[in-house]
Every structure is written in structure tokens, then in C-alpha cells.
């Protein structure tokens, strides 16, 4: 079975995005995490179970997605895919 180069590249990019998430870090004594970088690619929506916004004490506003494996991943709230995922999670 032959796989196209585009399909192979897509699989590699998705795997790389999942293997190198941008973790959320707690801010001082506050247990609410802050984000210092955003995930560059969209997560597969099926991997996301919930989300929350970072605290106003954080220097960067971010959405933190919690995956099915309980990993916290930072995302840019201005990105279209992030807004779509939030809407999807709110509706389900």
C-alpha cells in the first residue's frame, strides 16, 4: 500500500505536535498555570476533553486545553481553531 508524501508529512507533523506540547506552568504560589508559549499546530479535537483560561495575573492570555491523558497544552485564544474548539466544548 503506497502512502502519498503529503499524507506522510501530515502524520509526521501531527505526531510531532502531540509529542512536544507547550506545558502550562504555575505562577508563583498560585496554582493556576501561566503560558509562556503557544502550541503552533492544532491538536486533534478528539484528544481535548476540557479547557480553561489562564489567570489575569499571567503575562500572556491563553487557553489551556486538557487532553484525554490529562496533559495541559497552551493555545492562543485568538486563533480560529482555538475558538472553534471552545465553542465545540461549550456545546457538548
From Swiss-Prot:
<dbReference type="GO" id="GO:2000503">
    <property type="term" value="P:positive regulation of natural killer cell chemotaxis"/>
</dbReference>
<dbReference type="GO" id="GO:0071403">
    <property type="term" value="P:cellular response to high density lipoprotein particle stimulus"/>
</dbReference>
<dbReference type="GO" id="GO:0018894">
    <property type="term" value="P:dibenzo-p-dioxin metabolic process"/>
</dbReference>
<dbReference type="GO" id="GO:0002544">
    <property type="term" value="P:chronic inflammatory response"/>
</dbReference>
<dbReference type="GO" id="GO:0010759">
    <property type="term" value="P:positive regulation of macrophage chemotaxis"/>
</dbReference>
<feature type="disulfide bond">
    <location>
        <begin position="35"/>
        <end position="74"/>
    </location>
</feature>
<dbReference type="GO" id="GO:0070233">
    <property type="term" value="P:negative regulation of T cell apoptotic process"/>
</dbReference>
<dbReference type="GO" id="GO:0005615">
    <property type="term" value="C:extracellular space"/>
</dbReference>
<dbReference type="GO" id="GO:0009651">
    <property type="term" value="P:response to salt stress"/>
</dbReference>
<dbReference type="GO" id="GO:0034341">
    <property type="term" value="P:response to type II interferon"/>
</dbReference>
<dbReference type="GO" id="GO:0071230">
    <property type="term" value="P:cellular response to amino acid stimulus"/>
</dbReference>
<dbReference type="GO" id="GO:0014823">
    <property type="term" value="P:response to activity"/>
</dbReference>
<dbReference type="GO" id="GO:0045785">
    <property type="term" value="P:positive regulation of cell adhesion"/>
</dbReference>
<dbReference type="GO" id="GO:0071307">
    <property type="term" value="P:cellular response to vitamin K"/>
</dbReference>
<dbReference type="GO" id="GO:0051897">
    <property type="term" value="P:positive regulation of phosphatidylinositol 3-kinase/protein kinase B signal transduction"/>
</dbReference>
<dbReference type="GO" id="GO:0045666">
    <property type="term" value="P:positive regulation of neuron differentiation"/>
</dbReference>
<dbReference type="GO" id="GO:0070234">
    <property type="term" value="P:positive regulation of T cell apoptotic process"/>
</dbReference>
<dbReference type="GO" id="GO:0048247">
    <property type="term" value="P:lymphocyte chemotaxis"/>
</dbReference>
<dbReference type="InterPro" id="IPR000827">
    <property type="entry name" value="Chemokine_CC_CS"/>
</dbReference>
<dbReference type="GO" id="GO:0007267">
    <property type="term" value="P:cell-cell signaling"/>
</dbReference>
<dbReference type="GO" id="GO:0031667">
    <property type="term" value="P:response to nutrient levels"/>
</dbReference>
<dbReference type="GO" id="GO:0045672">
    <property type="term" value="P:positive regulation of osteoclast differentiation"/>
</dbReference>
<dbReference type="GO" id="GO:0042803">
    <property type="term" value="F:protein homodimerization activity"/>
</dbReference>
<dbReference type="GO" id="GO:0048020">
    <property type="term" value="F:CCR chemokine receptor binding"/>
</dbReference>
<dbReference type="GO" id="GO:0050796">
    <property type="term" value="P:regulation of insulin secretion"/>
</dbReference>
<dbReference type="GO" id="GO:0009636">
    <property type="term" value="P:response to toxic substance"/>
</dbReference>
<dbReference type="GO" id="GO:0010628">
    <property type="term" value="P:positive regulation of gene expression"/>
</dbReference>
<dbReference type="GO" id="GO:0006887">
    <property type="term" value="P:exocytosis"/>
</dbReference>
<keyword id="KW-0145">Chemotaxis</keyword>
<dbReference type="GO" id="GO:0071448">
    <property type="term" value="P:cellular response to alkyl hydroperoxide"/>
</dbReference>
<dbReference type="GO" id="GO:0014911">
    <property type="term" value="P:positive regulation of smooth muscle cell migration"/>
</dbReference>
<dbReference type="GO" id="GO:0032008">
    <property type="term" value="P:positive regulation of TOR signaling"/>
</dbReference>
<dbReference type="GO" id="GO:0042119">
    <property type="term" value="P:neutrophil activation"/>
</dbReference>
<dbReference type="GO" id="GO:0034612">
    <property type="term" value="P:response to tumor necrosis factor"/>
</dbReference>
<keyword id="KW-1015">Disulfide bond</keyword>
<dbReference type="GO" id="GO:0045071">
    <property type="term" value="P:negative regulation of viral genome replication"/>
</dbReference>
<dbReference type="GO" id="GO:0009410">
    <property type="term" value="P:response to xenobiotic stimulus"/>
</dbReference>
<comment type="similarity">
    <text>Belongs to the intercrine beta (chemokine CC) family.</text>
</comment>
<feature type="disulfide bond">
    <location>
        <begin position="34"/>
        <end position="58"/>
    </location>
</feature>
<dbReference type="GO" id="GO:0034112">
    <property type="term" value="P:positive regulation of homotypic cell-cell adhesion"/>
</dbReference>
<dbReference type="GO" id="GO:1904894">
    <property type="term" value="P:positive regulation of receptor signaling pathway via STAT"/>
</dbReference>
<dbReference type="Pfam" id="PF00048">
    <property type="entry name" value="IL8"/>
</dbReference>
Amino acid at each position: 500500500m503506497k502512502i502519498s508524501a503529503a499524507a506522510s508529512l501530515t502524520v509526521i507533523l501531527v505526531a510531532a505536535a502531540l509529542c512536544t506540547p507547550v506545558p502550562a506552568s504555575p505562577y508563583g504560589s498560585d496554582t493556576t498555570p501561566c503560558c509562556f508559549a503557544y502550541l503552533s499546530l492544532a491538536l486533534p479535537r478528539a484528544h481535548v476533553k476540557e479547557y480553561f483560561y489562564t489567570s489575569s495575573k499571567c503575562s500572556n492570555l491563553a487557553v489551556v486545553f486538557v487532553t484525554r491523558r490529562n496533559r495541559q497544552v497552551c493555545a492562543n485564544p485568538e486563533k480560529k481553531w482555538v475558538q472553534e474548539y471552545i465553542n465545540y466544548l461549550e456545546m457538548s
